[in-house]
Amino acid sequence: MKSGSGIALLALSLAGCGSGERESEAAAPSTEQAAEEAAPGARPAAFARCATCHQTAPGRNGVGPSLAGVYGAPAAHEPTYAYSKAMRASGLVWDEATLDAYLADPRALVPGTKMVFPGVRDPAERAAIIAYLETL
């Protein structure tokens, strides 16, 4: 009888475990939510992924460079950050189209980039992030 109750306890304990979704997928906002948060100046929930490595204050770098003033700037513009050779040589300017392509798949746009983030799949989330970057 003890082994039966032990199995039942184990089953109940495991029932509380997650559905197998990765945390970032489970916590990702819906497309509608991301679009609503794209209001000028609003920091969208999707930006939390960016904030893991990037600061928004000018000159304050984290694992990645500060994103202050990034919209409209040439790639590798932050003088106090050690960019990859690939990023320095890219010749990119961070406009809406370039940011959208980079956020979708950083390594496809700039092979050799230091950014290991796999990208933001949802176009509405990318649009919300880009709208926010434009305000920094």
Spans of model-derived segments:
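Bacterial signal peptide processing site
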Residues: C17-E21
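Sec-dependent bacterial lipoprotein signal peptides
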Residues: M1-G16
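Sec-exported extracytoplasmic/periplasmic mature domains
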Residues: A51-P58, G72, A104-A108, E134-T135
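Sequence/structural segment immediately N-terminal to covalent heme-attachment motifs in c-type
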Residues: Q33-R60, L67
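Gly/Gly-Pro-rich "capping" loops immediately C-terminal to redox-active cysteine motifs
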Residues: Q55-V93
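Solvent-exposed, polar/charged alpha-helical surfaces in well-ordered, non-transmembrane soluble domains
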Residues: G41-A48, P65, G69, A97, ...
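Solvent-exposed, acidic/flexible segments
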Residues: A39-R43, A57-R60, L92, E96, ...
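C-terminal capping alpha-helices of c-type cytochrome domains
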Residues: D95-L136
